[in-house]
UniProtKB/Swiss-Prot annotation:
Specific enzymatic cleavages in vivo yield mature proteins. Envelope glycoproteins are synthesized as an inactive precursor that is N-glycosylated and processed likely by host cell furin or by a furin-like protease in the Golgi to yield the mature SU and TM proteins. The cleavage site between SU and TM requires the minimal sequence [KR]-X-[KR]-R. The record marks R555, A556 as: Cleavage. Residues 761-783, 862-904 are annotated as: Disordered. Glycans are attached at residues 131, 255, 277, 296, 329, 367, 376, 385, 410, 427, 432, 452, 491, 509, 541, 597, 663, 694. GO terms for biological process: symbiont entry into host cell; virion attachment to host cell. It comes from Bovine immunodeficiency virus (strain R29) (BIV). GO terms for cellular component: host cell plasma membrane; membrane; viral envelope; virion membrane. This is Envelope glycoprotein. Residues 748-904 are cytoplasmic. Changing F494L: In strain: Isolate R29-106 and Isolate R29-Nadin. The sequence shown is that of isolate R29-127.
Length: 904
């Protein structure tokens, strides 16, 4: 008692944990194990926690080389958070009774990582929708060439850690490690750091560690391909948060190991940030309005055009209807415009994005084309100037007519962008922009824009925004936009970044200039190009791809481990069940073995069914890939057959002006024929695509899919039915239990007949009286068969309850002492044990059932006339009194019996 008071006084004086423990050890008040336990109870990190963190690091390195499923990541995060929460809470409640909880959760974390390493051999991408393509990248493809080698190494490593931990926990001063040396190392490795030094170290070192992790991933990206840094970071962060909340309330100090953990978290976050290719654009995603990010350089956006001009690459049949359009909040639009005002080109849709359309149209209007190298100030369309050897390489086209008037002058032009770019703007053409109009949308295809508007109409549009010298101003009405690589030539030439058009009419370029400017000004007045982050959005791709882009990894390792686990379970269950059922009834033992064999047969059947379905899936995917290649080849053959050269996902008619039928006038009939042929190609490609998709869906609609793993199937073996069916089963069991209770109550009433029968008046119709010495009166041994049956039922129920109580107490003791080597087989054989008890109880009930022994009327023992006594009839005691002969307590028994005998 005095020692406790002294320890309390020393604790009140504010001595550190290290000093107090060292003093206790030196004075011999604590053994080495007690000192370690005291250190743990004081809130320091448990060795098992360090082992768990080490195993988590193994999982992170495991994720570097192979791909971890999302479900496993959430399981790890949940387990670690739950462990820390229970561990820290239990220290406040009871320091001794919860020690096994921490050990259990550490084992669970290690076991989960072991399962993860095995599951990686069977991990695969989920089946994709045919029109959604998973584009493989260098930083997402798994680099695990021989997964089974990595799995064996990880299993051996984890088993080694478990062995070391078990040795350390069972060691004392005479064993492998000296306990005092262990304590000294533990104390020296956990020197306390005052908060005034700990917080600056964390605030300065954590960003540095994150930066180091970032550059480590940048320099060694091929090594750290797809790590589980997010798993380790989040789980450690939440676990430390739960622990540090309690530590902050208790005003405890930080130690070296805790600071190292936080630095590890920062390092992991830096590695993860680099893995997702974080850069200035990701920072812009965070600072920009939710869901959208301003695009500063619109010339880099992948544009595709719609036009009424007959250009194959701009045909509307390639796109069909707009596949994305939604209304957006006015507040968001206002924020987008405010962000756009800070960029000179955010709202300027570049005219040179028309280059592809102009090039296609110019090819149809050109007599000649050649490559030239020119510099600014050179008019290549004039015969007086010639090309030079230096300058900008461009394509020069000599046109027959005016491109603008022929193809664009009386048409409208519509532009679409490829995901993840979208256009934010208005549907209407109001001159004044109002953020409260309610017409703001985000779409992939802008509405058609008329290109022949006059200058007066264009002047009514909202001016383009730019941010120059801190003030909002307008750009000049130049063709090429702000700060683009456009070259100026003579009066007869018009140029874009890589194209020179030479027209016969000197004013032709002015016409094209006005039309291009018309489109640019109208589009820029109503639309802003933004980029949508890929978080939560579905990527719509250009081409159709098969559901699986990668060859299925071998499942031999996972299947072998799965069968090995089942074999161990079966052997353990058989041995434990055999030893448990030695003292059971022979019939029950036979029935249980039959049931057990049937269950094993069913499990084996499920395994082979699952294996055959996986083989079927492989055949389906192989057929799917072959059919896709046939589909692509058939499309190309059709394109070549119609004279349209394949170019990406489009094809081009490479016909010269003479083939089209041009001399000096437009031959609409010839061009219409070419358009009809192109439409035939589109229809044929669409039909091939539909047939291919239908065949692909029909091949895989009755299969499980390749994403189902062996361990998911192991879980499904125990997932018998849904929760609704379980509710129905529980209700049926309750109803049956009530019916059984009612039936037993009726049988108990029948059992009382013998006593009532013995106390009836001894009167006969013929005047003969029954001797009072009749053995049938007052002899409890001559009770009814129902009473004997009820006694047997009670004995069987008591025996079953006693056996179950012993089994339950045994399980509880094993669970409390963490004897997993004995608890696991006990739990595995528990269903068979319950089945045996049930069968034995039913056997005892039906073996002594009266229906099996009652063969007719029971011959009475009393009476001199030798008459047979009637069988026992139930006596209803209306008052519940045990005095059966009391005429005031119910019916007149004598009158009832006399009437009954008179009726005979």
């Amino acid at each position: 008692m005095d020692q406790d008071l002294d320890g309390a006084e020393r604790g009140e004086r504010g001595g550190g944990s290290e000093e107090l423990l060292q003093e206790e050890i030196n004075e011999g008040r604590l053994t080495a194990r007690e000192a370690l336990q005291t250190w743990i109870n004081n809130g320091e990190i448990h060795p098992w926690v360090l082992a768990g963190m080490l195993s988590m690091g193994v999982g992170m390195l495991l994720g570097v080389y192979c791909q971890l499923p999302d479900t496993l990541i959430w399981i790890l995060m949940f387990q670690l958070c739950l462990y820390w929460g229970l561990g820290e809470t239990s220290r406040e409640l009871d320091k001794d009774s919860w020690q096994w909880v921490r050990s259990v959760f550490i084992i669970a974390i290690l076991g989960t990582l072991t399962m993860a390493g095995t599951a990686l051999a069977d991990d695969d991408q989920s089946t994709l929708i045919p029109n959604i393509t998973k584009i493989p990248t260098k930083d997402t493809e798994p680099g695990c060439t021989y997964p089974w080698i990595l799995i064996l190494l990880i299993l051996a490593f984890i088993l080694g850690i478990l062995g070391i931990i078990l040795v350390l926990r069972r060691s004392n001063s005479e064993d492998i490690l000296a306990a005092r040396d262990t304590i000294d190392w533990w104390l020296s490795a956990n020197q306390e750091i005052p908060p005034k030094f700990a917080f600056p170290i964390i605030l300065i070192s954590s960003p540095l560690a994150g930066i180091i992790g970032y550059y480590v991933m940048e320099r060694h990206l091929e090594i750290f391909k797809k790590g589980c840094q997010i798993c380790g970071s989040l789980s450690s962060m939440w676990g430390m948060l739960l622990e540090e909340i309690g530590r902050w309330l208790a005003r405890r100090e930080w130690n070296v190991s805790r600071v190292m953990v936080i630095l590890l978290i920062s390092f992991s976050w830096g590695m993860y940030v680099n893995r997702v290719n974080a850069s200035g654009s990701h920072v812009a995603m965070v600072t920009s309005p939710p869901g959208y990010r301003i695009v500063n350089d619109t010339s880099q956006a992948p544009w595709y055009c719609f036009s009424s001009a007959p250009i194959p690459t701009c045909s509307s049949s390639q796109w069909g209807d707009k596949y994305f359009e939604e209304k957006i909040n006015e507040t968001l639009v206002k924020q987008v415009y405010e962000q756009a005002a800070k960029h000179s080109r955010a709202t300027w849709i570049e005219p040179d994005l028309l280059e592809e359309a102009v090039y296609e149209l110019a090819l149809l209007s050109a007599n000649d084309s050649r490559q030239v190298v020119v510099e600014n100030g050179t008019d290549v369309c004039s015969s007086q100037n010639s090309s030079t050897n230096k300058g900008h390489p461009m394509t020069l086209l000599k046109l027959r007519g005016q491109v603008s008037e022929t193809w664009i002058g009386n048409s409208s032009l519509q532009f679409c962008v490829q995901w993840p770019y979208v256009l934010v703007g208005l549907n209407n053409s109001d001159s004044n922009i109002s953020f409260n109009s309610g017409d703001w949308i985000a779409t992939n295809c802008m509405h058609p824009i008329t290109l022949n508007k006059s200058a007066q109409d264009l002047g009514k549009n909202f001016p383009r925004l730019t941010f120059l010298d801190g003030q909002l101003s307008q750009l000049k009405n130049t063709l090429c936009g702000h700060n683009t690589n456009c070259l100026k030539f003579g009066n007869k030439s018009f140029s874009t970044n890589s194209l020179i058009l030479c027209q016969d009419n000197p004013i032709g370029n002015d016409t094209f200039y006005s039309l291009s400017h018309s489109f640019s000004k109208q589009a820029s007045a109503r639309w802003i190009l933004v980029k949508v982050p890929s978080y939560g959005f579905v990527v719509v791709n250009d081409t159709d791809t098969p559901p699986s882009l990668r060859i299925r990894k071998p499942r031999a390792v996972g299947l072998a481990i799965f069968l090995l686990v089942l074999a161990i379970m079966a052997i353990t269950s058989s041995l434990v069940a055999a030893t448990t059922l030695v003292n059971q009834h022979t019939t029950a033992k036979v029935v249980e073995r039959v049931v057990q064999n049937v269950s094993y047969i069913a499990q084996t059947q499920d395994q082979f069914t699952h294996l055959f379905r996986n083989i079927n899936n492989r055949l389906n995917v192989l057929h799917h890939r072959v059919s896709y290649l046939e589909y692509v080849e058939e499309i190309r053959q059709k394109q070549v057959f119609f004279g349209c050269k394949p170019h990406g996902r489009y094809c081009h008619f490479d016909f010269g002006p003479e083939e089209v039928g041009w001399n000096n006038s437009w031959n609409s009939k010839t061009w219409n024929d070419l358009q009809d042929e192109y439409d035939k190609i589109e229809e044929k490609i669409l039909k091939i695509r539909v047939d291919w998709l239908n065949s692909s869906l029909s091949d895989t609609q009755d299969t499980f899919g390749l994403e189902t793993s062996i361990f998911d199937h192991l879980v499904q073996l125990f997932d018998w039915t849904s929760w609704k069916d379980w509710i129905k089963i529980i209700i049926v069991i309750i109803v049956l239990w009530l019916l059984i209770k009612i039936l037993l109550g009726m049988l108990r009433s029948c059992a009382k007949v013998s006593q009532n029968y013995q106390h009836l008046p001894a009167e006969e119709e013929d005047g003969d009286t029954e001797p009072e010495s009749s053995p049938a009166r007052g002899d409890p041994a001559s009770g009814s068969l129902y009473e004997n049956w009820l006694n047997k039922i009670g004995e069987s129920k008591n025996d079953a309850y006693r056996v179950w109580t012993e089994e339950y107490n045994s399980l509880r003791i094993l669970f409390a002492t963490c004897r997993w080597d004995l608890l696991t087989p006990q739990l595995l054989q528990l269903p068979f044990f319950l089945l045996t008890l049930l069968l034995k109880l039913l056997w005892d009930i039906f073996r002594h059932a009266p229906i099996l022994n009652l063969k007719g009327w029971t011959v009475g023992q009393g009476g001199t006339s030798g008459q047979q006594q009637p069988p026992d009839f139930p006596y209803v005691n209306w008052t519940g009194s045990r005095e059966q002969n009391n005429p005031e307590g119910g019916l007149d028994s004598g009158a009832w019996y006399e009437g009954l005998r008179g009726s005979q």
